[in-house]
């Protein structure tokens, strides 16, 4: 239940416990693309979409709003990339791979079963090797989006994880950078560019406001 703080904390504790045990010898095929490369790629895509929209003679409402907002969001995206590059990311990633850290890959409320006595995690189809902060970030973001980015809720989730699996300074910085990147904005722009560029739903228009 995403409205129950008790269930949310149990889910985070279960993730931390899972992360302590999910370690295997690295198989190169399952190593995820480095986050630095991912941000570089996504930022190129944002610039490419901006160029495409600028060159259109007739622009719909979505495209006009996109052009109004892209400078701000692209700045945040490039700043997150710069911060990641200047952080201890490479060292953190190397240590994660050396210890064989495994991520669930899709840790959200749909894949956590809150039982009477225990908590079960299901659907490991998207598992891979990476910094395990990825899982924590994905889960926290999904929950916080549903609660209007409640800072106290975010703090409690972090504490619940930290109590089970202590977070170091590099992991906390990595988590901060992930939250700083405008992921939802990139997804919206990428969806527009990859699908019909002529028809835009009202829902997507609202997301740009």
Language-model regions: role of each:
Residues 133-166, 179-198:
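Active-site activation/catalytic loop segments of kinase-like enzymes and analogous catalytic loops
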Residues 167-171:
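Helix N-cap / loop-to-helix initiation motif
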Residues 1-31:
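ATP-binding pocket architecture of kinase catalytic cores
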Residues 83-134:
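Active-site acidic catalytic loop and adjacent metal/ATP-binding pocket
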Residues 55-60, 191-209:
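Helical subdomain adjoining the active site within ATP-dependent kinase catalytic cores
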Residues 16-19, 58, 73, 94, ...:
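Gram-positive cell-envelope targeting signals
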Residues 29-102, 207:
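ATP-dependent phospho-/nucleotidyl transfer catalytic cores
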